[in-house]
Structures are given as structure tokens and as C-alpha cells.
């Protein structure tokens, strides 16, 4: 499937899908606990982001990791202008994934490697859904 076909497919789909190099992966529904954690993170980051230039988005905002890779993180922070009609965040500075039993390995492996390729990304946070633990992956000012 091409990227263009993926975007057309997503327009009419009742569920969200992530796109990785031509493959489409359905996003399963989360638990109440997962959603509660993601909402708490979103609210806290929104309070910190205001009144500055940053926008904080829920898992409904797709992130372009590369031209052939699109994910729906649980929370995304973008500090560059975003048009109201945008359906993709291209310059995130913070991405948050809340793990689930089916995604923990991917969040810590494939997605960690992919998110590291985003030049604007300063932090990738992985929130463990089972216990009070946040893994922080930072990039310093020099981009390291």
C-alpha cells in the first residue's frame, strides 16, 4: 500500500491504523487504565505548554516519523505552527507512548528507534501501564 492509499483508506476507516513501509497495522482499543494514564499525561503537559507556542495532542493526531512511517502516539507535543486542518504532526518535540501488553516491546524497540530519527524530537517518554514508571529518552541541545 502506498502512503497516498493509506491516507485514503484512513479517511473511511472506523478504526485507526499505523503505517510502516507499506504495511498497515490496526490500532486496538485501549483499557480504561491506559486511557486514564494517557489523559493524565496529556493534561499535565497541556498545563506546562500554556501559554507558550506548543500544542499538545491526544492519540487522534498522527505523527510522521518518516515518509513511509506514521504512528498514533498516545500524546504528542508540537512547538511549531500547526494548521487547524492538518491531519499529521510533522515536527513533534515530545512523544509519549503508554505501554500495553501487546505494545510494550514495540514501544521500547521499533518505535524508540524510529522516533530517534525525528530531528525535532527532544523527548520520548514510555509510560509503563502496570506500574508507576516512566522511561525517559532525551536528546540534548546538540542533538545527541
Which residues does each predicted region cover?
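Gly/Pro/Ser/Thr-rich low-complexity, intrinsically disordered segments predominantly at protein N-termini
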Residues: 1-144
